[in-house]
Amino acid sequence: MEPWTLGLTNMFMARKDEMDATVAWLKEFEAGYDSGFADQGIDVLLTPVTGSPAVKLGEQAPTVAYDTLYDRVVTFAAFTAPMNVAGAASMSVPLSWSPAGLPIGAMFSGKRGDDQLLFELALELEAARPWAGRLPGIVAT
């Protein structure tokens, strides 16, 4: 078994008494997500897509030691995971580029079901900062 799979299994088994409380917290987060938009007068949230720059090939392979990989994944997915839990409408658009020419994503998230708002925003962003033709110096085919 790969270190990642074994590590996750061990972590969840060691914390199985916390599962009910964790599931309840996740459901509360999901339920409160949309109301936060109305309460704060927010249409769209803007965050980075990832918590770190693009990783090198193999840095997040399931064969990497569990503790190392866990820290990397938690940092990398810090912004996408909550949106997945909330069931939020989200999109990633490449609005910036690294010195190596790799895209840096900006994540826009709306209320659940607000896909149309995000598609309209994507059209405006693409018109203002076209990205369709931008490719890094090396492209895998």
Segments the model singles out, each with a brief description of its role:
Residues M1-D34, D43, P48, S52, ...:
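Short helix-loop capping/hinge segments that flank enzyme active sites or metal/cofactor-binding pockets
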Residues D20, N84-T141:
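Structural helix-boundary/capping segments
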Residues D20, Q40, V55-A77:
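Short, surface-exposed loop/helix-turn segments at secondary-structure junctions
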Residues G32-S35, T68-V93:
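Small-aliphatic-rich amphipathic alpha-helix that forms the alpha element of a beta-alpha
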Residues F37-G41, R129:
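Sec/Tat-exported extracytoplasmic proteins
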Residues P53-A54, D115:
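Short, acidic Gly/Pro/Ser/Thr-rich loop/turn segments
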